[in-house]
């Protein structure tokens, strides 16, 4: 009379075909590397995954990521400090005039953009320098961040002279050492 079996082309799920694909002979064999994780067999990584790992571990990618992160963090920090500052929007020529909301927002945006650019440059410089130092030394330890902090701080400080460059090197290296000590 009425058949409960549905034809294969009507779009309903056929659990027997799914089970055969997942468990049966249509299942793709997984090649294992015997010593992958301390003797535990692990599957071989496909070429796409290896390529993505190489890209994400490159110094250029790390510097770009630090640049974008520094820009966002610096912008937020700049807008926050402008919001706290009581002199935002005031005109020094006419100190008695109350600034409009448009003037205050313009000043907050300018300060946020200034902080964002500075944080982005410092973040990219430090990250790229640390990656290059780590690649050169072949080690990942606290000395990399101290050396890259000294190089970055010195490069920023040397724009103001030799003394500022030496102080920038020492200050940024010390700050990097403290941050690295607490994060590791």
UniProtKB/Swiss-Prot annotation:
GO MF: mitochondrion targeting sequence binding; protein transmembrane transporter activity
Compartments where found: Mitochondrion inner membrane
Sorted UniProt keywords: Disulfide bond, Membrane, Mitochondrion, Mitochondrion inner membrane, Protein transport, Translocation, Transmembrane, Transmembrane helix, Transport
Cellular component terms (Gene Ontology): TIM22 mitochondrial import inner membrane insertion complex
UniProt membrane topology term: Multi-pass membrane protein
Homology family: Belongs to the Tim17/Tim22/Tim23 family.
Name this polypeptide is given: Mitochondrial import inner membrane translocase subunit Tim22
Gene: timm22
């Amino acid at each position: 009379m009425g058949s409960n079996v549905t034809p294969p082309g009507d779009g309903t799920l056929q659990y027997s075909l799914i089970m055969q694909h997942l468990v049966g002979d249509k299942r793709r064999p997984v090649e294992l590397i015997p010593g992958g994780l301390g003797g535990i067999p692990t599957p071989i990584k496909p070429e796409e995954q290896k390529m993505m790992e190489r890209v994400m571990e490159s110094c250029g990618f790390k510097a770009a990521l630090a640049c974008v992160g520094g820009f966002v963090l610096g912008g937020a920090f700049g807008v926050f400090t402008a919001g706290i500052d009581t002199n935002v929007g005031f005109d020094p020529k006419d100190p008695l005039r109350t600034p409009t909301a448009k003037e205050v927002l313009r000043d907050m945006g300018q300060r946020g953009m200034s902080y964002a650019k500075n944080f982005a440059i410092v973040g990219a410089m430090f990250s790229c320098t640390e990656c290059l130092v780590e690649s050169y030394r072949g080690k990942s330890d606290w000395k990399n961040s101290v050396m890259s902090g000294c190089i970055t701080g010195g490069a920023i400080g040397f724009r103001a002279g030799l003394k500022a460059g030496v102080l920038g090197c020492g200050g940024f290296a010390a700050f990097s050492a403290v941050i690295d000590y607490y994060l590791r």
